[in-house]
């Protein structure tokens, strides 16, 4: 990935891609992060690294999933360090902007991939990519982030519910 910056102590940037079933997330991520933490590997994430999560949309309605993620952005972004939020970071303004279009189709026709919720991955992979989390080799952080995102897109919403932005978990569930 051209956006990853090497350091003097870790001169070889690597990108790790993990594909697994949601039901296997915990065991797979624990194993991957265990290997990355071995002294012989000594993988580390610096500020140029990001955790990008692709959420499978093959069995979900992408329009509804996008709306749920869109209206949950405040919660998602407030959980992250300030350097990952586009309102406080020039880097995030360039590579991870907050989505402003409220519908999937509206966002997809006008945007590039450098948004908190990347809709461009849907055409190629049938996923929505969430780009905002900072890079990490901590399995617990990765697992909890993916579980949160999965809960958001899988939440039951009544047909007559009006989507609105939310700021706390209690408002969402």
Regions found by a protein language model. Give the residues of each.
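C-terminal accessory/tail domains of diverse enzymes
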Residues: 1-45, 58-173
